[in-house]
Protein backbone atom coordinates (compact mmCIF):
# COMPACT_ATOMS: atom_id res chain seq x y z
CA UNK A 1 0.00 0.00 0.00
CA UNK A 2 1.10 3.53 -0.76
CA UNK A 3 2.57 4.98 2.43
CA UNK A 4 0.60 8.16 1.87
CA UNK A 5 -2.68 6.29 1.61
CA UNK A 6 -2.96 5.35 5.26
CA UNK A 7 -6.17 7.37 5.49
CA UNK A 8 -7.87 4.57 3.58
CA UNK A 9 -7.16 1.73 6.01
CA UNK A 10 -9.42 0.61 8.87
CA UNK A 11 -7.84 3.06 11.27
CA UNK A 12 -8.50 5.81 8.74
CA UNK A 13 -12.04 6.41 9.96
CA UNK A 14 -10.66 7.93 13.15
CA UNK A 15 -8.28 10.21 11.25
CA UNK A 16 -10.84 11.09 8.60
CA UNK A 17 -13.42 12.31 11.12
CA UNK A 18 -11.61 15.48 12.25
CA UNK A 19 -10.76 16.40 8.64
CA UNK A 20 -14.37 15.96 7.57
CA UNK A 21 -15.63 17.89 10.62
CA UNK A 22 -13.28 20.81 9.97
CA UNK A 23 -14.43 20.90 6.34
CA UNK A 24 -18.06 21.00 7.47
CA UNK A 25 -17.43 23.91 9.88
CA UNK A 26 -15.64 25.76 7.08
CA UNK A 27 -18.77 25.43 4.95
CA UNK A 28 -20.89 26.68 7.86
CA UNK A 29 -18.73 29.82 7.92
CA UNK A 30 -19.06 30.55 4.19
CA UNK A 31 -22.80 29.90 4.29
CA UNK A 32 -23.42 32.17 7.27
CA UNK A 33 -21.63 34.98 5.44
CA UNK A 34 -23.84 34.36 2.38
CA UNK A 35 -27.10 34.21 4.35
CA UNK A 36 -26.39 37.27 6.46
CA UNK A 37 -25.43 39.22 3.34
CA UNK A 38 -28.81 38.22 1.84
CA UNK A 39 -30.58 39.64 4.89
CA UNK A 40 -28.72 42.96 4.89
CA UNK A 41 -28.95 43.74 1.16
CA UNK A 42 -31.52 46.45 1.82
CA UNK A 43 -29.37 47.99 4.56
CA UNK A 44 -26.29 47.92 2.33
CA UNK A 45 -28.20 49.55 -0.51
CA UNK A 46 -29.30 52.36 1.81
CA UNK A 47 -25.92 52.74 3.55
CA UNK A 48 -23.96 53.13 0.31
CA UNK A 49 -26.75 54.69 -1.84
CA UNK A 50 -26.86 51.83 -4.36
CA UNK A 51 -29.55 50.70 -6.78
CA UNK A 52 -30.36 47.00 -6.77
CA UNK A 53 -28.40 46.58 -10.02
CA UNK A 54 -25.35 48.32 -8.51
CA UNK A 55 -25.63 46.11 -5.44
CA UNK A 56 -25.70 43.11 -7.75
CA UNK A 57 -22.38 44.18 -9.24
CA UNK A 58 -20.82 44.35 -5.77
CA UNK A 59 -22.11 40.85 -4.97
CA UNK A 60 -20.67 39.76 -8.32
CA UNK A 61 -17.24 40.53 -6.83
CA UNK A 62 -17.72 37.80 -4.21
CA UNK A 63 -18.64 35.24 -6.85
CA UNK A 64 -15.85 36.20 -9.24
CA UNK A 65 -13.33 36.32 -6.41
CA UNK A 66 -14.36 32.75 -5.62
CA UNK A 67 -14.12 31.83 -9.30
CA UNK A 68 -10.52 33.02 -9.60
CA UNK A 69 -9.21 31.37 -6.45
CA UNK A 70 -11.06 28.06 -6.75
CA UNK A 71 -9.62 27.71 -10.27
CA UNK A 72 -6.09 28.70 -9.23
CA UNK A 73 -6.38 26.79 -5.96
CA UNK A 74 -7.41 23.62 -7.78
CA UNK A 75 -4.00 23.63 -9.44
CA UNK A 76 -2.03 24.85 -6.42
CA UNK A 77 -3.55 22.19 -4.18
CA UNK A 78 -1.02 19.59 -5.34
CA UNK A 79 1.89 22.04 -5.48
CA UNK A 80 1.78 23.93 -2.17
CA UNK A 81 -0.48 21.58 -0.24
CA UNK A 82 -3.96 21.86 1.20
CA UNK A 83 -2.83 23.36 4.50
CA UNK A 84 -1.34 26.48 2.87
CA UNK A 85 -4.55 27.17 0.96
CA UNK A 86 -6.65 26.81 4.11
CA UNK A 87 -4.39 29.41 5.75
CA UNK A 88 -4.99 31.85 2.89
CA UNK A 89 -8.73 31.25 3.13
CA UNK A 90 -8.76 31.93 6.86
CA UNK A 91 -6.83 35.19 6.53
CA UNK A 92 -9.07 36.30 3.67
CA UNK A 93 -12.25 35.63 5.61
CA UNK A 94 -11.09 37.53 8.69
CA UNK A 95 -9.79 40.51 6.70
CA UNK A 96 -12.81 40.62 4.36
CA UNK A 97 -15.34 40.54 7.17
CA UNK A 98 -13.54 43.27 9.10
CA UNK A 99 -13.34 45.46 5.98
CA UNK A 100 -17.07 45.04 5.42
CA UNK A 101 -17.99 45.76 9.03
CA UNK A 102 -15.86 48.92 9.19
CA UNK A 103 -16.41 50.06 5.60
CA UNK A 104 -16.42 53.86 5.30
CA UNK A 105 -17.59 53.89 1.70
CA UNK A 106 -18.51 51.94 -1.41
CA UNK A 107 -14.89 51.08 -2.34
CA UNK A 108 -14.01 49.51 1.00
CA UNK A 109 -17.29 47.59 1.06
CA UNK A 110 -16.70 46.24 -2.45
CA UNK A 111 -13.08 45.32 -1.65
CA UNK A 112 -14.12 43.44 1.48
CA UNK A 113 -16.76 41.53 -0.47
CA UNK A 114 -14.17 40.60 -3.11
CA UNK A 115 -11.72 39.41 -0.45
CA UNK A 116 -14.39 37.17 1.09
CA UNK A 117 -14.93 35.70 -2.37
CA UNK A 118 -11.20 34.95 -2.66
CA UNK A 119 -11.30 33.17 0.71
CA UNK A 120 -14.38 31.13 -0.23
CA UNK A 121 -12.63 29.94 -3.38
CA UNK A 122 -9.44 28.80 -1.67
CA UNK A 123 -11.51 26.90 0.87
CA UNK A 124 -13.58 25.13 -1.78
CA UNK A 125 -10.40 24.26 -3.69
CA UNK A 126 -9.26 22.29 -0.62
CA UNK A 127 -12.30 20.64 0.92
CA UNK A 128 -13.74 18.97 -2.20
CA UNK A 129 -10.56 17.08 -3.17
CA UNK A 130 -9.88 16.43 0.52
CA UNK A 131 -13.21 14.65 1.00
CA UNK A 132 -12.86 12.83 -2.33
CA UNK A 133 -9.43 11.61 -1.21
CA UNK A 134 -10.36 10.38 2.25
CA UNK A 135 -13.59 8.72 1.03
CA UNK A 136 -12.58 7.30 -2.40
CA UNK A 137 -15.45 4.78 -2.53
CA UNK A 138 -18.23 7.13 -1.36
CA UNK A 139 -17.46 10.37 -3.18
CA UNK A 140 -20.91 11.56 -4.25
CA UNK A 141 -22.49 10.51 -0.95
CA UNK A 142 -19.86 12.19 1.23
CA UNK A 143 -19.70 15.33 -0.92
CA UNK A 144 -23.46 15.67 -0.50
CA UNK A 145 -23.04 15.21 3.26
CA UNK A 146 -20.27 17.82 3.30
CA UNK A 147 -22.30 20.30 1.29
CA UNK A 148 -25.28 19.75 3.60
CA UNK A 149 -23.43 22.02 6.00
CA UNK A 150 -23.61 24.90 3.53
CA UNK A 151 -27.40 25.15 3.77
CA UNK A 152 -27.09 24.19 7.43
CA UNK A 153 -24.86 27.20 7.99
CA UNK A 154 -27.22 29.36 5.96
CA UNK A 155 -30.07 28.36 8.28
CA UNK A 156 -27.98 29.39 11.28
CA UNK A 157 -27.08 32.69 9.62
CA UNK A 158 -30.67 33.40 8.58
CA UNK A 159 -32.12 32.69 12.02
CA UNK A 160 -29.42 34.73 13.77
CA UNK A 161 -29.97 37.62 11.35
CA UNK A 162 -33.72 37.50 12.01
CA UNK A 163 -33.17 37.46 15.78
CA UNK A 164 -30.76 40.39 15.58
CA UNK A 165 -33.27 42.31 13.46
CA UNK A 166 -35.91 41.76 16.14
CA UNK A 167 -33.36 43.01 18.69
CA UNK A 168 -32.86 46.20 16.61
CA UNK A 169 -29.18 45.46 16.03
CA UNK A 170 -27.39 47.19 13.10
CA UNK A 171 -26.23 45.26 10.06
CA UNK A 172 -22.60 45.46 11.22
CA UNK A 173 -23.42 43.32 14.26
CA UNK A 174 -25.09 40.72 12.05
CA UNK A 175 -22.02 40.54 9.82
CA UNK A 176 -19.69 40.21 12.82
CA UNK A 177 -21.47 37.02 13.93
CA UNK A 178 -19.91 35.20 10.95
CA UNK A 179 -16.45 35.64 12.48
CA UNK A 180 -17.23 32.93 15.05
CA UNK A 181 -17.30 29.89 12.70
CA UNK A 182 -14.37 31.35 10.75
CA UNK A 183 -12.23 31.32 13.89
CA UNK A 184 -13.42 27.79 14.73
CA UNK A 185 -12.52 26.25 11.35
CA UNK A 186 -9.16 28.02 11.38
CA UNK A 187 -8.31 26.50 14.77
CA UNK A 188 -9.50 23.02 13.71
CA UNK A 189 -7.46 22.92 10.50
CA UNK A 190 -4.40 24.31 12.29
CA UNK A 191 -4.18 21.08 14.30
CA UNK A 192 -4.56 18.69 11.33
CA UNK A 193 -2.09 17.08 8.95
CA UNK A 194 -3.77 16.94 5.55
CA UNK A 195 -3.06 14.21 2.94
CA UNK A 196 -1.96 14.51 -0.66
CA UNK A 197 -4.78 14.31 -3.20
CA UNK A 198 -6.05 11.04 -4.66
CA UNK A 199 -4.53 11.85 -8.06
CA UNK A 200 -1.04 12.39 -6.63
CA UNK A 201 -1.27 9.25 -4.50
CA UNK A 202 -2.19 7.26 -7.63
CA UNK A 203 0.81 8.56 -9.60
CA UNK A 204 -1.23 10.36 -12.30
CA UNK A 205 0.89 12.92 -14.14
CA UNK A 206 0.01 16.60 -14.33
CA UNK A 207 -0.16 16.35 -18.12
CA UNK A 208 -2.80 13.62 -17.95
CA UNK A 209 -4.71 15.72 -15.43
CA UNK A 210 -4.97 18.62 -17.87
CA UNK A 211 -5.83 16.34 -20.80
CA UNK A 212 -8.87 15.07 -18.91
CA UNK A 213 -10.48 18.50 -19.27
CA UNK A 214 -10.58 18.08 -23.06
CA UNK A 215 -12.88 15.05 -23.06
CA UNK A 216 -16.18 15.85 -24.83
CA UNK A 217 -18.27 14.51 -21.94
CA UNK A 218 -16.44 16.72 -19.47
CA UNK A 219 -16.93 19.78 -21.69
CA UNK A 220 -20.68 19.09 -21.66
CA UNK A 221 -20.57 18.54 -17.89
CA UNK A 222 -18.70 21.82 -17.46
CA UNK A 223 -21.42 23.63 -19.42
CA UNK A 224 -24.12 22.06 -17.24
CA UNK A 225 -22.41 23.43 -14.14
CA UNK A 226 -23.06 26.96 -15.40
CA UNK A 227 -26.79 26.25 -15.60
CA UNK A 228 -27.14 24.39 -12.28
CA UNK A 229 -25.26 27.07 -10.35
CA UNK A 230 -27.27 29.93 -11.86
CA UNK A 231 -30.49 28.09 -11.03
CA UNK A 232 -29.49 27.59 -7.39
CA UNK A 233 -27.41 30.59 -6.37
CA UNK A 234 -28.88 33.27 -8.61
CA UNK A 235 -32.30 33.29 -6.91
CA UNK A 236 -31.05 32.27 -3.45
CA UNK A 237 -29.04 35.47 -2.90
CA UNK A 238 -32.12 37.56 -3.74
CA UNK A 239 -35.00 35.43 -2.53
CA UNK A 240 -35.30 37.01 0.93
CA UNK A 241 -35.41 40.50 -0.59
CA UNK A 242 -37.88 39.46 -3.33
CA UNK A 243 -40.33 37.71 -1.01
CA UNK A 244 -40.39 40.71 1.33
CA UNK A 245 -42.23 42.52 -1.46
CA UNK A 246 -44.31 39.70 -2.95
CA UNK A 247 -45.34 37.28 -0.21
CA UNK A 248 -44.12 37.85 3.35
CA UNK A 249 -42.15 40.46 5.26
CA UNK A 250 -40.13 37.66 6.87
CA UNK A 251 -38.43 36.70 3.61
CA UNK A 252 -35.28 35.72 5.49
CA UNK A 253 -37.24 32.96 7.26
CA UNK A 254 -38.27 31.54 3.89
CA UNK A 255 -34.58 31.47 2.98
CA UNK A 256 -33.94 29.63 6.24
CA UNK A 257 -36.68 27.14 5.31
CA UNK A 258 -35.11 26.62 1.88
CA UNK A 259 -31.67 26.03 3.28
CA UNK A 260 -32.96 23.70 6.03
CA UNK A 261 -34.71 21.60 3.39
CA UNK A 262 -31.49 21.53 1.36
CA UNK A 263 -29.46 20.44 4.38
CA UNK A 264 -31.77 17.53 5.17
CA UNK A 265 -31.89 16.46 1.53
CA UNK A 266 -28.11 16.39 1.23
CA UNK A 267 -27.59 14.54 4.51
CA UNK A 268 -29.79 11.71 3.24
CA UNK A 269 -28.57 11.77 -0.37
CA UNK A 270 -26.90 8.34 -0.17
CA UNK A 271 -30.01 6.15 -0.61
CA UNK A 272 -31.41 8.46 -3.29
CA UNK A 273 -28.15 8.36 -5.28
CA UNK A 274 -28.02 4.57 -5.07
CA UNK A 275 -31.63 4.27 -6.25
CA UNK A 276 -31.64 6.77 -9.12
CA UNK A 277 -27.91 7.13 -9.93
CA UNK A 278 -26.29 10.58 -9.65
CA UNK A 279 -27.39 11.65 -13.14
CA UNK A 280 -30.94 10.39 -12.62
CA UNK A 281 -31.04 12.42 -9.43
CA UNK A 282 -29.90 15.52 -11.32
CA UNK A 283 -32.65 15.08 -13.94
CA UNK A 284 -35.31 14.89 -11.22
CA UNK A 285 -33.73 17.86 -9.44
CA UNK A 286 -33.90 20.02 -12.55
CA UNK A 287 -37.62 19.32 -12.97
CA UNK A 288 -38.36 20.16 -9.33
CA UNK A 289 -36.30 23.35 -9.28
CA UNK A 290 -38.01 24.69 -12.40
CA UNK A 291 -41.45 23.99 -10.97
CA UNK A 292 -40.44 25.58 -7.67
CA UNK A 293 -39.20 28.79 -9.28
CA UNK A 294 -42.40 29.22 -11.27
CA UNK A 295 -44.48 28.61 -8.15
CA UNK A 296 -42.42 31.12 -6.16
CA UNK A 297 -42.99 33.77 -8.80
CA UNK A 298 -46.76 33.43 -8.24
CA UNK A 299 -46.62 33.20 -4.43
CA UNK A 300 -48.44 36.09 -2.74
CA UNK A 301 -48.78 34.84 0.84
CA UNK A 302 -46.59 33.21 3.46
CA UNK A 303 -48.15 29.70 3.07
CA UNK A 304 -47.74 29.68 -0.71
CA UNK A 305 -44.20 31.02 -0.40
CA UNK A 306 -43.21 28.24 2.01
CA UNK A 307 -44.85 25.55 -0.14
CA UNK A 308 -43.25 26.76 -3.38
CA UNK A 309 -39.86 27.24 -1.75
CA UNK A 310 -39.94 23.63 -0.49
CA UNK A 311 -40.28 22.36 -4.07
CA UNK A 312 -37.49 24.68 -5.21
CA UNK A 313 -35.22 23.59 -2.34
CA UNK A 314 -35.74 19.88 -3.03
CA UNK A 315 -34.78 20.60 -6.63
CA UNK A 316 -31.60 22.59 -6.10
CA UNK A 317 -30.25 20.84 -3.00
CA UNK A 318 -28.47 18.09 -4.93
CA UNK A 319 -27.12 20.19 -7.81
CA UNK A 320 -23.74 21.42 -6.58
CA UNK A 321 -22.42 18.40 -4.62
CA UNK A 322 -23.70 15.85 -7.14
CA UNK A 323 -22.14 17.74 -10.05
CA UNK A 324 -18.83 17.61 -8.15
CA UNK A 325 -19.39 13.98 -7.18
CA UNK A 326 -19.90 12.92 -10.79
CA UNK A 327 -16.81 14.92 -11.78
CA UNK A 328 -14.72 13.07 -9.19
CA UNK A 329 -16.23 9.67 -10.05
CA UNK A 330 -16.23 9.88 -13.85
CA UNK A 331 -13.08 11.99 -14.30
CA UNK A 332 -10.79 11.04 -11.36
CA UNK A 333 -7.67 11.58 -13.47
CA UNK A 334 -8.51 15.30 -13.48
CA UNK A 335 -8.18 15.41 -9.69
CA UNK A 336 -8.34 18.71 -7.83
CA UNK A 337 -7.91 20.63 -11.11
CA UNK A 338 -11.26 19.52 -12.54
CA UNK A 339 -13.02 20.00 -9.21
CA UNK A 340 -11.59 23.52 -9.09
CA UNK A 341 -12.61 24.14 -12.68
CA UNK A 342 -16.17 23.06 -11.91
CA UNK A 343 -16.26 25.26 -8.82
CA UNK A 344 -14.98 28.18 -10.88
CA UNK A 345 -17.66 27.63 -13.51
CA UNK A 346 -20.37 27.43 -10.88
CA UNK A 347 -19.42 30.64 -9.16
CA UNK A 348 -18.75 32.53 -12.37
CA UNK A 349 -22.26 31.63 -13.43
CA UNK A 350 -23.79 32.48 -10.05
CA UNK A 351 -21.91 35.77 -10.07
CA UNK A 352 -23.16 36.74 -13.52
CA UNK A 353 -26.67 35.94 -12.36
CA UNK A 354 -26.50 38.62 -9.62
CA UNK A 355 -26.53 41.78 -11.77
CA UNK A 356 -29.02 40.09 -14.09
CA UNK A 357 -31.31 39.38 -11.15
CA UNK A 358 -30.89 42.99 -10.05
CA UNK A 359 -31.68 44.24 -13.56
CA UNK A 360 -34.81 42.10 -13.85
CA UNK A 361 -35.86 43.23 -10.37
CA UNK A 362 -35.45 46.93 -11.22
CA UNK A 363 -37.02 46.61 -14.68
CA UNK A 364 -39.80 44.02 -14.38
CA UNK A 365 -40.42 43.66 -10.66
CA UNK A 366 -39.45 40.98 -8.14
CA UNK A 367 -41.81 38.17 -9.17
CA UNK A 368 -40.88 38.17 -12.86
CA UNK A 369 -37.19 38.11 -11.95
CA UNK A 370 -37.72 34.57 -10.65
CA UNK A 371 -39.73 33.59 -13.72
CA UNK A 372 -36.87 34.36 -16.09
CA UNK A 373 -34.50 32.02 -14.23
CA UNK A 374 -36.95 29.10 -14.57
CA UNK A 375 -35.88 28.66 -18.21
CA UNK A 376 -32.51 27.26 -17.09
CA UNK A 377 -33.73 24.12 -15.27
CA UNK A 378 -35.97 23.41 -18.25
CA UNK A 379 -32.85 23.05 -20.40
CA UNK A 380 -31.22 20.88 -17.74
CA UNK A 381 -34.13 18.43 -17.74
CA UNK A 382 -33.42 17.72 -21.40
CA UNK A 383 -29.65 17.32 -20.94
CA UNK A 384 -29.68 15.23 -17.75
CA UNK A 385 -32.62 13.16 -18.99
CA UNK A 386 -30.70 12.31 -22.16
CA UNK A 387 -27.55 11.37 -20.23
CA UNK A 388 -29.58 9.22 -17.83
CA UNK A 389 -31.14 7.30 -20.70
CA UNK A 390 -27.72 6.86 -22.30
CA UNK A 391 -26.37 5.37 -19.07
CA UNK A 392 -29.32 2.98 -18.82
CA UNK A 393 -28.69 1.81 -22.38
CA UNK A 394 -25.09 1.01 -21.41
CA UNK A 395 -25.96 -0.91 -18.25
CA UNK A 396 -26.19 1.90 -15.70
CA UNK A 397 -24.04 4.63 -14.18
CA UNK A 398 -20.43 3.49 -13.77
CA UNK A 399 -17.71 4.95 -11.55
CA UNK A 400 -14.16 5.20 -12.95
CA UNK A 401 -11.66 3.93 -10.37
CA UNK A 402 -7.96 4.76 -10.15
CA UNK A 403 -6.03 1.50 -9.79
CA UNK A 404 -9.00 -0.64 -8.84
CA UNK A 405 -12.11 -2.47 -10.01
CA UNK A 406 -15.27 -0.62 -10.94
CA UNK A 407 -18.11 -0.97 -8.43
CA UNK A 408 -21.50 -2.28 -9.63
CA UNK A 409 -23.48 0.07 -11.91
CA UNK A 410 -26.03 2.38 -10.27
CA UNK A 411 -29.51 3.33 -11.38
CA UNK A 412 -30.23 0.32 -13.55
CA UNK A 413 -33.74 -0.19 -14.83
Language-model segments: which ranges?
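Helix-breaking motifs and short loop linkers at transmembrane-helix boundaries and internal kinks
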Residues: 49, 81, 102-107, 136, ...
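Conserved MFS/SLC helix-loop-helix module at the cytosolic interface between two early adjacent transmembrane helices
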Residues: 68-107
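Helix-loop-helix hairpin linking two adjacent transmembrane segments in secondary transporters
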Residues: 137-138, 145-197
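Extracytoplasmic
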Residues: 18-50, 235-240, 353-357
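Cytoplasmic helix-loop-helix junction between adjacent transmembrane helices
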Residues: 112-148
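Helix-to-loop junctions at the C-terminal end of transmembrane segments
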Residues: 69-81, 265-278, 361
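Residue-level signature of mid-helix packing/kink "hotspots" within the transmembrane helices
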Residues: 35, 62-71, 155, 259-267, ...
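Extracytoplasmic gate region of multi-pass secondary transporters
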Residues: 37-39, 214-263, 353-354, 358
